[in-house]
Amino acid sequence: MSHPSPSWALPPEVPWPRFLRLLRHPEPPRGWLEGAAELPELKKRPLLLRWVAQHPKAPAHLRTSLLARLPWRALAAVAGDAAAHPQARQQATEKLQQLWPVMTIGERRSLALHAPRPLWSLIWRTPVASVLAAFLQHPMLGLEALVALIQPPLRPAQAEALAASRWREAEPVAEQVLQALDRSLQLPDSGLALGHAAPWIRALGDDARLLAASRLVSPALRRMVHPRRETVD
């Protein structure tokens, strides 16, 4: 069995700055990643240990073992890194989905801002406005993806977070919120009121309001949305 060259030694034989660069090298010698994972200093630093777990050359058994031990921040880093092994990203995402129900509100809020796409629908169903507000600032969240998430039943926390977000003046979002609101107002214990429609009505021009009103079922909401044009004799 061949041994790593001196340049591929582990701390303390090599300085830590060099070791951290080696963790990102695409072709480490056989056995080196396993040795790195056993370093006591690395075990204490999950955000560094994740570089071993996500390495494309990490053996499958090592990857699975490490990912099972990583905390959510390190898992989120793996799941969001396009350079990580695809299996590592998938396993990290699945682990985050398992952890979500037991995470604190503060942890959920932090994760929501950078969560991988497979978690978006799970986050969107969270009835906590602060978590939703963080999610709506996600740098990868686009208009099309957001509109797809806004479906009945619309919840008060969702409506309020949207109304306070950067999306509050986007016409496609306004149209989708009004449709979801229309189908949710009559549901038992919806917690919604006609007033939730106000910011979205203001976001639409008269022509868009006319079209939106034609698609609504609730008479009261339809009257609110419909532009009342004055007629001239």
Give a label for each model feature.
Residues 1-233:
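Alpha-helical scaffold segments
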